[in-house]
Curated annotation (Swiss-Prot):
Domain KH, first and last residues per copy: 166-230
Region (Disordered): 1-31
Stored InterPro entries: KH_dom (IPR004087), KH_dom_type_1 (IPR004088), KH_dom_type_1_sf (IPR036612), ZFP36-like (IPR045877), Znf_CCCH (IPR000571), Znf_CCCH_sf (IPR036855)
Name the record gives this protein: Zinc finger CCCH domain-containing protein 44
Highest taxon listed in the record's lineage: Eukaryota
Zinc finger (C3H1-type): 32-60, 98-126, 259-286
Sorted UniProt keywords: DNA-binding, Metal-binding, Repeat, RNA-binding, Zinc, Zinc-finger
């Protein structure tokens, strides 16, 4: 009986000690293993346990230090104070730490990393262990600039203010021609303004009292048209000859020394004469006159 009792007592005590030893070992593993880096976390597959993992996910020195320690069997290193272990995460996903401790598995692929400089994973070994928020200033070959300069206007774009711009022109003529250019009651100047749309005025010449200035104002096309009509009018008034000694008789007098209607109007034959009956050139053979005899 005593022997049997002794046999039963021994295994019971042994089993109790074994259970206590296993429980103590389990608790020590759960606490002490946090001093070693997790090999799964620093691999491309990642750690499936996340924050419940018994190994360290935030190792000083990042991937290189962890790989060197695990390959050479280094001693356990205490976790730095103030840092929380990383939770589960996948590359290109939301951050779980303020330090880049994992390599981005999209960076060296053909498609590249879509997050660019904002990626929370290291784009190269030089970024391991660096703060994420301070990494945005680094140039990134795969990322695009967050801000782009506005496109500059092309050379073909013309400012709206240049359309229909107003201009002025000045023609200096002999003062004796001013009356003929104006016409009776201003008929000639009014006709030119009505036909071209340009404003016409005759003023004194500042430097020569024997000259008059014909000032034109309007668009470039209006001034061009009005200038041509004024030139044509001057030619008709002067008759392509020096002014007569007695200008008071007028070019329409038809007396000796007058060239009125002595030449055919070139614009009338083209159908473009704008002076009509007031033209100083003949509109057809019926109006043509013989030039006066030379004195």
């Amino acid at each position: 009986m005593e022997a049997g009792g002794g046999k039963r007592a021994a295994p019971e005590g042994t089993n109790g000690a074994a259970k206590r030893a296993r429980a103590s070992e389990s608790s020590q593993v759960g606490v002490g293993s946090k001093l070693k880096p997790c090999t799964k976390f620093f691999s491309t597959s990642g750690c499936p346990f996340g924050s419940s993992c018994h190994f360290l996910h935030n190792f000083p020195g990042g991937y290189q230090a962890a790989a060197k320690m695990t390959s050479h069997g280094g001693t356990a290193v205490a976790a730095p104070p103030g840092r929380m272990p990383l939770g589960p995460g996948a590359p290109n996903g939301p951050p779980t730490s303020s330090v880049k401790t994992r390599m981005c598995n999209k960076y060296n692929t053909a498609e590249g990393c879509k997050w660019g400089s904002k990626c929370h994973f290291a784009h190269g070994e030089r970024e391991l262990g660096k703060p994420m928020l301070l990494d945005n200033s680094m140039p990134h070959p795969m990322g695009s600039m967050p801000f782009e300069a506005p496109p500059m206007p092309g050379p073909d774009i013309v400012p709206p203010s240049t359309f229909g711009a107003s201009a002025t022109a000045k023609i200096s003529v002999d003062a004796s021609l001013a009356g003929g250019i104006i016409g009776k009651g201003g008929t000639n100047t009014k006709h030119i303004s009505r036909m071209t749309g340009a404003k016409l005025a005759i003023r004194d010449n500042e430097s020569n009292p024997n000259l008059k200035n014909i000032e034109l104002e309007g668009t470039f096309d209006q001034i061009k048209h009005a200038s041509a009509m004024v030139t044509e009018l001057i030619v008709r008034i002067s008759g392509n000859a020096p002014p007569a000694k007695n200008p008071g008789r007028g070019s329409h007098a038809g007396g000796p020394g007058s060239n009125f209607k002595t030449k055919l109007c070139e614009n009338f034959n083209k159908g473009s004469c704008t002076f009509g009956d007031r033209c100083h050139f003949a509109h057809g053979e019926s109006e043509l006159r013989k030039p006066p005899a030379a004195a």
